[in-house]
Design a protein with these regions (language model features):
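Extreme N-terminal segment that seeds HTH/winged-HTH DNA-binding domains in transcriptional regulators
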Residues: 1-33, 39, 87-119
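A short alpha-helical element within helix-turn-helix/winged-helix DNA-binding domains
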Residues: 33-44, 58
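Short, Lys/Arg-rich nucleic-acid/phosphate-binding segment
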Residues: 34, 66-74, 79
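Short Asp/Glu-rich motifs
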Residues: 41-42, 77-78, 119
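Short, charge-rich, low-complexity alpha-helical interaction segments
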Residues: 56-64
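Short, charged/polar, Gly/Pro-enriched secondary-structure boundary elements
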Residues: 80-85
Length: 119
């Protein structure tokens, strides 16, 4: 089934974010090989060049590493993984707070809502 993309951001960034979330959630473990460009392109129903660009972005961030002709692997560097996790958490919190501000909800009110909705 093809992945769903939005028109507000480049597709390669959405693919990179999805892979990042898969890594940080543990779907792909540190040191584990990730699917190939062709596999992900078929799964996402996009051009392989788009997936390649997403992979380049992730390699630049240090989240994945390329091992010659063997393939691409999740880094096993815990500092990089933790840094990526913190960066993503900050981004999500910023987006959340922007949405709360649009609703005229204060930080205190947002915290109260979060505490009430703990999973």
């Amino acid at each position: 089934m093809a992945w769903k993309f939005t028109s507000d951001r480049p597709v390669y960034l959405q693919i990179a974010e999805r892979i990042t979330k898969s890594v940080l959630s543990g779907e792909y473990k540190p040191g584990e090989q990730i699917p190939s460009v062709r596999q992900l392109a078929l799964e996402a129903a996009v051009n392989p060049n788009t997936v390649q660009r997403a992979f380049s972005e992730l390699e630049n961030n240090g989240l994945i590493i390329s091992k010659n002709t063997i393939g691409r692997f999740v880094t096993d560097d815990t500092e990089i993984l933790e840094s990526c996790r913190n960066a993503l958490a900050k981004k999500l919190v910023k987006e959340f707070m922007q949405n709360m501000n649009h609703l005229s909800i204060t930080i205190e009110q947002a915290i109260k809502i979060i505490e009430e909705e703990k999973l």
